[in-house]
Amino acid sequence: MSVKSILTEPNKLLRQISKPVENVGDEERRLMDDMLDTMYAAPGIGLAAIQIGVPKRIIVMDISRDEDKKEPRYFVNPVIKNKNDITSKYEEGCLSVPDQFAEIERPNECEVEYLDYNGKKQLLKADGLLATCIQHEMDHLEGVLFIDYLSKLKKSMIIKKLSKIKSNRIIV
């Protein structure tokens, strides 16, 4: 298991649509382990495979917020089967959009079908932060970032700021 580099906006790979996983095998489990290590090291509560440059429909998350009681979740080929009409707002951030946060409104409940770490089909009814995190990470699988829900002006300002930060980096 190893910590990988996280891609940051602007990066064309982040706008790519991820491809379904044919089979959950050792390679996919190693990827999920690396994703989880990367997410914890960042630190964050969710990560999509595309954020480390792998265009597969895989997301990992852990919303437990307790260092001693980690509760990792693995979603392969997740599909939202149902969403609630009632929405809630959470201030979202993203490891691929560093140090930027915005209040985003999403359905406060969703039902998601997916394959787990071992390739077994699962159905989960999620609400609150878990539902928000699932929807946020699943957006990555479609090439969508949380900043895409903002006004054009706000989004443009964030991208300019991130581009400037990237161009000022010195790699030694």
Curated annotation (Swiss-Prot):
Q: Which residues form the active site?
A: E137
UniProt cross-references to NCBIfam families, sorted A to Z: pept_deformyl, PRK00150.1-3
The residues that the entry says bind Fe cation are: C94, H136, H140
Q: Which family does it belong to?
A: Belongs to the polypeptide deformylase family.
**InterPro entries registered for this protein in UniProt:** Peptide_deformylase (IPR023635), Peptide_deformylase_sf (IPR036821)
Q: A GO term (biological process) for this protein?
A: translation
* Molecular function as annotated in GO: metal ion binding; peptide deformylase activity
Q: What is this protein called?
A: Peptide deformylase
Cofactor needs: Fe(2+)
Q: Which residues form a coiled coil?
A: none
Reaction catalysed by this chain? N-terminal N-formyl-L-methionyl-[peptide] + H2O = N-terminal L-methionyl-[peptide] + formate
Function description: Removes the formyl group from the N-terminal Met of newly synthesized proteins. Requires at least a dipeptide for an efficient rate of reaction. N-terminal L-methionine is a prerequisite for activity but the enzyme has broad specificity at other positions.
